[in-house]
């Protein structure tokens, strides 16, 4: 596999010389299944790099195939993870594309253990390894004649890219490389492969899903940087919110029709790819709109308690609509996640599904306070029960989220007690029926918001992020599993 060498170096000149003399090219990589079969037949032929890759794969396989783990038991796959990590320390001194593949798997596994900061660092390390190798740049057919090998380079790069963008968005951290520095083609189908070549065809399947995941991960990172970072912006907050919604709408409309329909409706029996894209899309919409929802809650509560500052602008129709859209997205994701919990397809140790469930639970809790909607309150309680069950099954992520859920539940009890004394809620209420009958991801509510030339969120400009939200610093003595 080619490694990027600076053309000005003596090593590059020597390499050019050997290429001219030998004129040799490389062939496509061996598939992982072949590597596993070879290791089973003859373990002596399995070198350190191959063993490390297999151990990383075994760790992921055990984590995602296990349904429950008791407190006295080791986390599923931890033995393989430790072995792979130790081997990788030796292998990392020499850049290889196999090392990037191993890092990608170890990053996903670290996240499953709720070591999300380690996962973020490993994903960033994988992306920097890609840059050292030169995977962020296209390789011409003259440099690498094997088309399958070129496609493999492309897919390894974008796999690391997705993790870097996704983890950065999840943690609110910077990305590792700017898009302007990337010159790589999107994944493509290798139509020239014969149908009998099932091994290579399987390697390069799901191109539409892969490309959609790349673009959505990029949008998620952009939304986080645009709305939640403390960098200086030349555009008002309302314009950045509207741009985020428009970008998400364009992403959805740009999907191939079969994939778009599957993601919009998520019919029974949908693939894991479609369900995950559906949930990720909803999460991006929630990210773009929940600052408005939280600020609407703050103004409503101040108004009901008579503590609203003089001169505060009234809440605009755009803000109300965005708040309703946020709740609508949460309800939609809740239905998908609760159904997956019922039918047994909810992966116990997958961090992202657990995080999505926690995210929508908080939005439903806010909706129950704003709208006095008993349905959203009941759904919040059900989501809390699912998280508690995941915690009992050994999910470290659910264990941490349950602490926040319990604190939220106690707060809701206090709010309801105050309402009984006062005799009213935070009027005017949000539309508590919105979203229950809507099937499309971008329904009439969001379409109306997207059609507006400018959202009226001026009441939020002075208090958005920089002034209204203080920076959080968690105590260092927290349990490592709950960071």
Predicted features along the sequence, with ranges:
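Compositionally biased, low-complexity linear motifs
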Residues: 30-41, 185-192
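Short, polar loop/linker segments at the starts of domains and inter-domain junctions
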Residues: 2-6, 11-12, 31, 70-74, ...
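Extended, leucine-rich alpha-helical cores of fungal transcription factors
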Residues: 35-56, 62-181, 201-254, 264-382
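Substrate-access "cap/lid" subdomains that shape
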Residues: 259
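Short helix-interrupting loop/turn segments at helix-coil junctions
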Residues: 25-27
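Intrinsically disordered, low-complexity regulatory regions with latent secondary structure
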Residues: 1-23, 57, 145-214, 374, ...
């Amino acid at each position: 596999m080619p490694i990027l060498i600076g053309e000005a170096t003596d090593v590059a000149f020597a390499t050019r010389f050997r290429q001219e003399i030998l004129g040799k090219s490389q062939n496509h990589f061996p598939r992982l299944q072949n590597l596993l079969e070879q290791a089973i037949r003859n373990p002596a032929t399995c070198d350190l790099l191959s063993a490390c890759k297999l151990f990383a794969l075994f760790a992921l396989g055990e984590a995602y195939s296990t349904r429950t783990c008791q407190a006295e038991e080791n986390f599923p796959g931890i033995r393989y993870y430790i072995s792979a990590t130790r081997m990788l320390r030796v292998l990392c001194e020499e850049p290889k594309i196999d090392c990037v593949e191993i890092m990608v798997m170890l990053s996903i596994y670290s996240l499953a253990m709720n070591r999300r900061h380690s996962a973020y660092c490993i994903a960033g390390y994988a992306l920097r390894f890609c840059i050292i190798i030169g995977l962020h740049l296209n390789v011409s057919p003259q440099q690498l004649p094997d088309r399958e090998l070129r496609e493999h380079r492309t897919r390894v790069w974008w796999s690391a890219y997705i993790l870097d963008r996704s983890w950065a968005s999840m943690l609110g951290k910077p990305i590792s490389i700017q898009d302007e520095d990337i010159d790589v083609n999107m994944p493509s189908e290798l139509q020239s492969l014969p149908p009998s070549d099932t091994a290579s065809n399987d390697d390069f399947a799901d191109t539409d899903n892969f490309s959609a995941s790349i673009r959505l991960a990029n949008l998620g990172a952009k939304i986080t940087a645009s709305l939640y970072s403390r960098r200086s912006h030349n555009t008002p907050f309302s314009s950045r919110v509207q741009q985020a919604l428009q970008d998400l709408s364009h992403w959805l409309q740009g999907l191939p029709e079969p994939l778009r329909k599957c993601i919009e409706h998520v019919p029974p029996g949908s693939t894991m790819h479609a369900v995950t894209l559906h949930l990720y899309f909803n999460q991006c919409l929630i990210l773009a709109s929940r600052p408005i929802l939280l600020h609407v809650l703050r103004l409503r509560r101040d108004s009901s308690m008579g503590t609203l500052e003089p001169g505060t602008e009234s809440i605009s129709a755009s803000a109300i609509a965005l708040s309703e859209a946020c709740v609508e997205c949460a309800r939609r994701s809740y239905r998908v996640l609760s159904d997956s919990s019922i039918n047994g397809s909810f992966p116990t140790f997958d961090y992202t599904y657990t995080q999505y469930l926690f995210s929508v639970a908080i939005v439903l809790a806010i909706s129950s306070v704003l709208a006095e909607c008993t349905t959203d309150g009941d759904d919040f309680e059900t989501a809390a029960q699912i998280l508690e069950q995941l915690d009992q099954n050994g999910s470290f992520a659910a264990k941490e989220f349950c602490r926040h859920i319990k604190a939220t539940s106690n707060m809701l009890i206090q709010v309801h007690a105050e309402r009984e004394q006062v005799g009213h809620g935070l009027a005017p209420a949000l539309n508590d029926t919105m979203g229950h009958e809507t099937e499309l991801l971008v329904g009439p509510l969001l379409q109306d918001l997207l059609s507006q030339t400018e959202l009226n969120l001026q009441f939020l400009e002075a208090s958005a992020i920089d002034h209204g939200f203080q920076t959080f610093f968690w105590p260092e003595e927290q349990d490592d599993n709950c960071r």
